[in-house]
Amino acid sequence: MRTLEYGTGHEKTLLFLPCTAEPEWAFTDSVGLLSQDYHVMQIVYDGHGETGEDFISVETTVDEVTDWLQAHGITRLNAAYGCSLGGACLTRFLALGKIPVERAVIDAGITPYRMPLILRRLACLRDDLGFRLIAKSRKVLETVYPPERWTMPGRDPVKEYDALAAYLKTYSKRTVRNIFWSANNYTLPTKPAEMGCQITYWYGEEEKQARHSNICFIKQYFPRAQLHKIPKMDHAELVMMYPQEFYRRIMAFLTQAQAAQNERG
């Protein structure tokens, strides 16, 4: 695991747990905006890129993140953001409560399956094969993720997809298998730790059906969590393709408490 730090001069801290299957540079613009206000710690998971190590599990990742934060003297976080696999990691991080978080955004976070083992294994096999097909075929990659939608304005889609295709080929078979098994089968305590964190769960309007079980899980596990639908967005689209809108929305949530305090005056 690697940790990229930005805005280190700020006192306020924000943990940034990205989704899988995207290189660290896919989040540069959004992280850059957040670093105007926060000391941002962006996690790069094992097995993502040429790290020389395989991704093991959500549990291992959360332990490593916790150890890194504690080793660097961070005993409390002002904010945390996790998307997809990162949302799974953030869900467990919050549930354990070893490092309190004031406000957290779980963006389309994956939650544990609640179905028989055989069905979970079949789902993992489906996801594993789907990833391998996308990583192997440029045509499939561009069909599933059309460049005209998934390339930011002003950037060269050919160069970006060349880089993305090369990046996806760095994932080992073990990493891919572990990602899809662990993201959907990680363990949680029966009840989450009580630490007063304000949690919101984001999901794109165009992925609502796909996130249905995740939304139900979050509502049950974190009863006080707010739900926030992002209009006209698909999975992880806001944070990667619309950094200014992402920044506006996340800062509106992260600064709610301060705004209310200022109004009370």
How does the language model describe each region?
Residues 4-50:
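Conserved HGGG/HGGXW glycine-rich cap/lid loop of the alpha/beta-hydrolase fold
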Residues 41-81:
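Active-site loop/oxyanion-hole signature of alpha/beta-hydrolase fold enzymes
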Residues 82-90:
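Gly/Ala-rich beta-loop-alpha elbow adjacent to hydrolase catalytic centers
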Residues 95, 101-133:
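Flexible "cap/lid" loop of the alpha/beta hydrolase fold
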Residues 115-117, 136-193:
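Conserved alpha/beta-hydrolase catalytic His-Asp/Glu region
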Residues 195, 201-203:
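Short beta-strand/loop motif that positions the catalytic acidic residue
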Residues 205-210:
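Acidic catalytic loop of the alpha/beta-hydrolase fold
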Residues 233-245:
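Catalytic histidine-centered segment of alpha/beta-hydrolase-like enzymes
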